[in-house]
Design a protein with these regions (language model features):
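Conserved class I S-adenosyl-L-methionine
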Residues: 1-23, 37, 126-187
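Class I SAM-dependent methyltransferase "Motif I" SAM/SAH-binding loop
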Residues: 32-34
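Class I SAM-dependent methyltransferase SAM/SAH-binding core
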Residues: 40-84
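A short acidic, Gly/Pro-enriched loop at the edge of an enzyme's catalytic core
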Residues: 87-95
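A short SAM/SAH-binding and catalytic strip from SAM-dependent methyltransferases
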Residues: 95-109
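A short glycine-rich, Lys/Arg-flanked "PGG" loop and its adjoining helix->strand segment in the class I
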Residues: 111-124
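Short alpha-helix
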Residues: 208-225, 231
């Protein structure tokens, strides 16, 4: 959240989605929990949290942060893939959350994983996935991430994946209509074989990515047994705002919360749920 302003907006939105389903919740599974951006705050609030991730480094960092926060005794750390939940009985956790879109990185098992989340949740599920319609405009804007930079001169290794645009960037850009049509039809950002080859060469940090349509996500969750499914698209408003104004809105203390409130209301409207910055968020309850 110190590098990109869209992370601030996404986190604020997801916090509210999670808060809305916490009534009666004691136990939480955070699947694909990373360094504990959501699991540790929930543990601080008194919930019993299972923090599941496949990365040793993320688990180690999360443990360290949980200990520093004094909540390690309320957390269980599990090394596992989100595709390996078959061992958990039905209703193992009151709430299952999976945010920052790890479900989109387990293609072709994405629907299976969503079904597992619903199965092992007793009360509610909150999940975010990559958005097909939200991603599509990036085909026409190679510099889309720079709109959200907190500091245009930031020196961070992650920026090698987001090079600053130059005159050559725009002059050399050509639309690939065939690839764009393929993406709209399949939801796959790239051919899986191409992605695997790039990963082997160190040319991308991202695995095969499957991007959902909003109604597709809702259908899969409903068929698995989730009720009152609510969809939203965090970032639908902010992606229309120039970087200097975004920075003013988010870093002026008198404006920040009012702006985040407006973002949440706008981004939750059914008409824009597919046009979030990167993700579609879905939440729902068990009967």
């Amino acid at each position: 959240e110190t590098l990109f302003m869209d992370d601030i907006i996404q986190k604020a939105h997801l916090d509210r989605e999670i808060d809305a389903v916490l009534a009666g919740v004691t136990t939480v599974l955070d699947a694909g929990a990373g360094a504990g951006r959501f699991s540790i705050p929930l543990a601080k609030r008194g919930f019993e949290v299972t923090h599941l991730d496949i990365s040793d480094s993320m688990l180690a960092k999360a443990r360290e942060m949980a200990e520093a926060a004094g909540v390690a005794d309320r957390m269980v750390f599990v090394k596992s893939r989100i595709t390996e939940l078959a061992g958990y009985p039905n209703g193992s956790f009151d709430l299952v959350i999976c945010v920052d879109a790890p479900v989109s990185y387990v293609y072709p098992k994405h629907n299976q994983v969503l079904g597992d989340f619903v199965r092992i949740a007793r009360k509610a599920v909150v999940v975010s996935v990559a958005s097909r319609l939200g991603f599509f405009p990036y085909w026409y804007n190679p510099a889309q991430k720079h709109q959200y930079l907190v500091d245009q001169d930031v020196d961070d290794s992650i920026m090698k994946w987001y090079p600053l645009p130059t005159d050559e960037t725009w002059e050399g850009w050509r639309p690939d209509f065939e690839d764009q049509r393929r993406f709209l039809d399949t939801g796959l950002l790239e051919d899986p074989d191409v992605v695997f080859a790039k990963m082997e060469r160190g040319e991308t940090p991202w695995p095969v990515t499957y991007c959902f349509l909003p109604e597709e996500l809702a259908r899969v969750l409903r068929e698995a047994g989730l009720q009152n499914v609510r969809l939203s698209g965090p970032g639908a408003l902010s992606r229309t705002i120039p970087q200097p104004l975004l920075k003013k809105l988010l870093f002026n203390p008198t404006l920040r919360q009012k702006f985040l409130d407006i973002c949440y209301e706008f981004d939750s409207h059914p008409s824009v749920c597919g046009m979030g910055k990167d993700t579609v968020v879905a939440s729902g309850v068990k009967g």
